[in-house]
């Protein structure tokens, strides 16, 4: 993991140079929407949490419209452990029974979301938290998980959903009023149930519906890695399919990369997987030309 930069040790001249280099990117993304999937260590380490909050505020101040979709897997696991439940995953998706869904709603829509909103507001931003149930934002349907061992069969993983439709009106209204939306990935179904939706999938769909200029997905690794542990900086759809096929991309990276690729194919101009363990990784990706993480291309 990269060591954090001590900004107090940077000379005024170098700080000015850094800002000058960011200017073309500020112009490029001014007035544009950037969807950020926020998760991993960046949500649990205090230094990284504060750095992320400041990054998001800076983006808003220079005229870029950040929309945050957050995860909270470790926090959910911790809450489940307190009530004696063990988290179970199939193909990177959390098996969610009724009791687990109650915990998910409490943790994501309450504890985690409010922590993010409070931190952004503490540093001078104006963040508003909402779940996919608020304002009819995310219509969900039950996810039918294909059984890899039995083609044509499906595995029931409970109240786990996929995005059926997104109504972006509430997000656009918040953006128009200069707020930063912070979204918990919980949707509502026509059956009246709440659904736990993978945050990567929500971020990808939301980026598409909002016509976002960029989708940034934060993770706990440098990006997509090959089997030897080398960073793959640029991946096409064909290359990604091959990595799925040979098992290089597996587990929790499956929904992340699938969502990133779908967003790229649906017209999101720039899609990147970045290392959230590096301080200011969001700014490095958006406001510099330094190659960072893995770029996902549709062709």
From Swiss-Prot:
Under Gene Ontology molecular function, one entry of this record is: acetylglutamate kinase activity
Among the entry's GO cellular component annotations, what is one?
cytoplasm
Entries under SUPFAM superfamilies matching the protein: Carbamate kinase-like
Which chain positions carry the site (Transition state stabilizer)?
37, 256
Its chief place of residence is cytoplasm
Reactions catalysed, semicolon-separated, are: N-acetyl-L-glutamate + ATP = N-acetyl-L-glutamyl 5-phosphate + ADP
NCBIfam families per the record? argB
Stated EC number for the protein is 2.7.2.8
The protein's matches in InterPro entries, at most eight in alphabetical order, are given as:
AceGlu_kinase-like_sf, AcgluKinase_fam, ArgB, Asp/Glu/Uridylate_kinase, NAGK-C
Question: What's the short name of a Pfam family annotated to this entry?
Answer: AA_kinase
What keywords sit in the KW lines? Amino-acid biosynthesis, Arginine biosynthesis, ATP-binding, Cytoplasm, Kinase, Nucleotide-binding, Transferase
Pathway field of the UniProt record reads: Amino-acid biosynthesis; L-arginine biosynthesis; N(2)-acetyl-L-ornithine from L-glutamate: step 2/4
**Which CDD domains does the record associate with it?**
AAK_NAGK-C
Where does it live in the cell?
A: Cytoplasm
What is the protein's name according to its record? Acetylglutamate kinase
What job does the chain carry out?
Catalyzes the ATP-dependent phosphorylation of N-acetyl-L-glutamate.
Family membership, please give it.
Belongs to the acetylglutamate kinase family. ArgB subfamily.
So which domain of life are we looking at? Bacteria
Provide the species name: Burkholderia mallei (strain ATCC 23344)
